[in-house]
Regions:
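Non-catalytic cap/lid and distal C-terminal segments of serine-dependent acyl enzymes
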Residues: 4-7, 11-13, 19-31, 36-357
Length: 357
């Protein structure tokens, strides 16, 4: 376990300009060589749930079951999914006033994306949106999926067809009046980390479908050295083969999914982006004291990559003539759940409440 002294030492080392240059250099070198990135250990494999593809051929998506879950106003929905060929479990937080119409927020998880959404597990959804009139939809069991359609099933993580599920199958269920949900017609998508990358990418690819997007500490490039390196790390850390996601090497599919290279889809929808600069603060030292010794260095590297990527996306949007995006850079802070409740609220205010007030 990490002591306060250890965390203070990590901060002294990683808060230097030299360390930032070494992080960038290291990530760039890793992504260049398959012999290196294929050796990235599956550090999250014990924390994730990889549901087995049942190979069940469902004709249409259907709500098979709906039960109360562990938190107030939270239900678990079991969706028969034709594209995933299995039952996909989705956690749904109902609005505080269910008799009144509400928008839907599709809220995506980080890399582990287990059966219980991290937004609920870490208490940050309650912190950020508990009193907001919104239906929050949280897909689960999406470990390392990038929330994308993969070109092939993976022997470790199974079948991922999340683009189709999130933009076609799941909305058909959620917006069906027979569920009793009073939907006001507005859809927002958001997430943190891997979920931020997925949310912004899906919004850019389906701008006619979403009415706003929130990206918290995401990585939005798939072809830059930093972006490709972090994407490979996400895929390998859950034990999957990156070739099954978008193909082997720099394929056209990898290129198409680079939002920093193709930001045009974000032109006409509200966008909120957040990243901290990965400068380790006293608060971060307190947070990580008692955690594993790898947590603080890992959180620093992840947030530095997110910070770099967010700046790249903002620059691309500005160069394309976009000025509507709200981008918040925080001085101090690493990749840690404790920051995201407040930022979820800020993002919600920016992309939804400011548009309807």
């Amino acid at each position: 376990m990490a002591t306060r002294r250890y965390c203070t030492l990590v901060a002294a080392v990683l808060n230097t300009k030299t360390a930032r240059k070494l992080i960038s250099f290291g990530v760039k070198m890793v992504q260049k060589s398959p012999a290196v990135w294929r050796r990235i250990p599956p550090i999250y494999i014990d924390e994730t749930a990889h549901p087995v593809t049942s190979n069940q051929d469902y004709d249409v998506p259907r709500l098979a079951k709906r039960v109360f879950d562990e938190a107030p106003r939270v239900e678990r929905w079991f969706i028969e999914s034709p594209c995933m060929r299995r039952i996909v479990e989705v956690q749904v937080m109902l609005p505080p006033r269910p008799e009144e119409p509400a928008p839907m927020l599709y809220l995506l998880d980080g890399v582990t994306a287990p059966r219980r959404s991290g937004w609920l597990r870490e208490g940050q959804l309650e912190k950020g949106l508990n009193n907001e009139q919104v239906i929050v939809v949280m897909p689960t069991e999406a470990s390392g999926s990038l929330y994308e359609n993969w070109v092939a099933d993976d022997p470790e993580v199974g079948r991922h067809q999340w683009d189709t599920f999130l933009t076609q199958e799941l909305p058909n269920i959620m917006e069906d009046p027979t569920t009793g949900l009073k939907f006001n017609g507005r859809r927002i998508i958001g997430g943190l980390s891997m979920g931020a990358s997925g949310a912004i990418r899906l919004a850019a690819k389906h701008p006619e479908f979403y009415h706003g997007a929130i990206g918290l500490s995401g990585c939005y490039s798939t072809t830059s050295a930093m972006g490709r390196g972090m994407t490979l790390a996400i895929l390998r850390c859950v034990g999957s083969d990156p070739d099954n996601a978008w193909g082997t090497g720099p394929t056209p599919t990898w290129a198409r999914n680079d939002v920093a290279d193709h930001p045009e889809g974000l032109r006409n929808i509200p966008v909120y982006l957040f990243a901290a600069d990965a400068h380790i603060t006293k608060y971060d030292i307190e947070l990580h004291t008692g955690r594993t010794r790898l947590d603080l260095p890992g959180a620093t590297i992840l947030e530095y990559a997110s910070y770099t990527s967010t700046r790249d996306l903002e620059r691309a949007m500005i160069n394309a003539g976009m000025t509507h995006q709200v981008v918040h850079y925080q001085y101090g802070g690493v990749h840690a759940w404790e920051y995201y409740g407040d930022q979820l609220k800020a993002g919600w205010d920016a992309v939804y409440k400011s548009q309807v007030s």
